[in-house]
Amino acid sequence: MQEQYRPEDIETQVQLHWQEKQTFKVTEDTSKEKYYCLSMLPYPSGRLHMGHVRNYTIGDVISRYQRMLGKNVLQPIGWDAFGLPAEGAAVKNNTAPAPWTYDNIEYMKNQLKLLGFGYDWDREIATCSPDYYRWEQWFFTKLYEKGMVYKKTSAVNWCPHDLTVLANEQVIDGCCWRCDTKVERKEIPQWFIKITDYADQLLNDLDTLESWPEQVKTMQRNWIGRSEGVDIVFNVADSEEKLSVYTTRPDTFMGVTYVAVAAGHPLSLQAAATNPALADFVAECRNTKVAEAEMATMEKKGMATGLYAIHPLTGEKLPIWAANFVLMDYGTGAVMAVPGHDARDWEFATKYNLPIKPVILAADGSEPDLSQEAMTEKGILFNSGEFDGLNYEDGFNAVADKLVALGVGQRKVNYRLRDWGVSRQRYWGAPIPMVTLEDGTVVPTPEDQLPVILPEDVVMDGITSPIKADPEWAKTTVNGVPGLRETDTFDTFMESSWYYARYTCPQFDKGMLDPAAANYWLPVDQYVGGIEHAIMHLMYFRFFHKLLRDAGLVDSDEPAKRLLCQGMVLADAFYYSGSNGERIWVSPVDAIVERDDKGRIIKATDAEGHELVYAGMSKMSKSKNNGIDPQVMVEKYGADTVRLFMMFASPAEMTLEWQESGVEGANRFLKRVWRLAYDHTAKGATAPLDVANLTEEQKSLRRDLHKTIAKVTDDVGRRQTFNTAIAAVMELMNKLGRAPQETEQDRALLQEALLAVVRMLYPFTPHVCFSLWQALGGEGDIDTAPWPVADEQAMVEDSKLVVVQVNGKVRGRITVPADATEQQVRERAGQEHLVAKYLDGVTVRKVIYVPGKLLNLVVG
């Protein structure tokens, strides 16, 4: 082996070897236990960022470790290739989304290869390929035939100037990002999949996901939002109309003082027809964004409709208000308001001077003070007629039973979860395979006409989708009848909801999935991705798996057994103020930094002399210009160093702070391993290790070696605390570096230790370990070498070091057999001259013995 560690030479050679040998190519092998490790597929944005590197390094470490355990390991990769950014980039660069996307895929693929990830490249998929989305279209038509798909009108952001639909991220301060025209809400027909039919399964099966983070499961439970309550029907005064509301708090029903309805509710529209002010309010609400995060924080506004609802139990007339916080898409589009016991209702009632009636006693039994806020806690009912004195549960049931008995109520389970709207009015996505015939009948595209191919050679104007702008594209026939194709495309979450299953059989052309391959590999054993995907992607991913199961394509209930959500990668952020006071962000690579003796930044400038403000550590992002290019780091230090730092600097689930000093430290460690191996091999071959005749020092070192193997095995396999595994190997390396190399057995022991160290580091730093394994004379390639197994016998201690105290002060240390009795330890202590002089001529009054650790002799 060469004397110096030169990663650029090693990594190129090893990667070429893997490519030629197809080391990571796998097929179904029923004689082996399978292991499917998957990292969430990347969007081909153009360049890898450190978040990608962290995600894929974690996946690669797990995959390589499992392969060393003798399992048949599948680790695939692909590209989530459709989506809005490609459209923007195409307009900006005067190209089409397809070539931009394919160029990016090629570039990023080479970046992944430079990092040494062990992917089966034969299984690579790009979701924009017709060979892929063909089966998604086919499956959608099958769901339609099963009644799982329907079309209804739904609100979108509409630019009246460009006459186009805008994604939420294209609406800036309520205006179109391109022309600055005020955006309107518009109802248009869209396709939905009935995820609500699976709400109970999605909720209940969370309990089977024992190896998913509790945080993700809680977020999904909240998103599904199962609640038990009552549907209540109110008559509308002086009208034949009825008004339906749903409540989870029937115990507060006697405290209803008004009813709020959505601006788009039939009663609002009816009243607005003769009330111009209300009509203006309805129009204003129609242009309000309906994202839940914004709904929660926006100002609550309303207007009286002049209509009244009749309380079914008291006969009271309750004013009906149109309110901007009630949505037609949610429930019945109407809510009963109990301002005494609901914070939002209280805020609205206070603003518009509506009555507030308490009907639940405070915890101390007193009437609650509602002057400053609502009392939302549950408690004993009062002010509620026949229900006074009941607790929450009894009150809930008594009111519900009464409403049911009167025929104005029905117990109901509701869900916060809404059906999945899969229509997007964009070009760069998979066409939705539906056709509207001449007579208005809507039918699925026949199977023999699939895939409905998205034309890729298009001109983007940045306004209208090319397939919407071209009337010829939509023309088709079904069974000889002319029709028009759907020009909306699928939400890109469709592609990422089933890609994991297609990886099991990417070339299969007789169906969506090859059942034999899919059921061999699925479910995924380990899924790795960010917590930001907890509710959208991970919910659709679970839902789609159940759809595949019910279509007979897979035979498991859940798509992934274990989920690891890696933390974000942070970096220093610096800026200076521009001439207009705007912040101009400077890359940390370009910041010239002064630090104090504790390493804290005290001053920073850039090459042009701007004094920089240090904004602390924040997530690497384009907006703050604080991303570190992985390629630059790989060229500077090598892929193994970058991978090692990524896995050592922080626990996988926690945020990782990018520090180049830490990268340098990882590089120094690999150089140290290389140097020790080089010095060792330079002395020639070693004799076999004679375990039976080791010295105490050699036994102790071997014990440390095998304890390290046991710890690293547990840390990598069960606990997934990769940083502590690396720390344990580093600690062992320190001991190996200090160990004497004077005898044949010293060298034989170092040979055993280095072969183990190289295998323990291999999942993290595969290139350097590949070379070291060869240099050390390891059998075959390290890619097929087994994981080291801790020798239980080696970890058993023959002797113990016991601290001896006299009257609580340490007077000596003695080595005794591990199984020595207290009497034997006392005798041995008496023979130790440093101890003996303190026992001369005194009486031992008391003995405190902690087996194998401490002997305290109390004398007087």
Swiss-Prot record:
InterPro entries: aa-tRNA-synth_I_CS, aa-tRNA-synth_Ia, Leu-tRNA-ligase, Leu_tRNA-synth_edit, M/V/L/I-tRNA-synth_anticd-bd, Methionyl/Leucyl_tRNA_Synth, Rossmann-like_a/b/a_fold, tRNAsynth_Ia_anticodon-bd
Enzyme Commission designation: 6.1.1.4
Gene Ontology cellular component terms for the protein in this record: cytosol
Enzyme class: ligase
Protein name in UniProt: Leucine--tRNA ligase
Keyword Cytoplasm annotated: yes
Source organism: Yersinia enterocolitica serotype O:8 / biotype 1B (strain NCTC 13174 / 8081)
Top-level taxon: Bacteria
Protein localization: Cytoplasm
Family in the record: Belongs to the class-I aminoacyl-tRNA synthetase family.
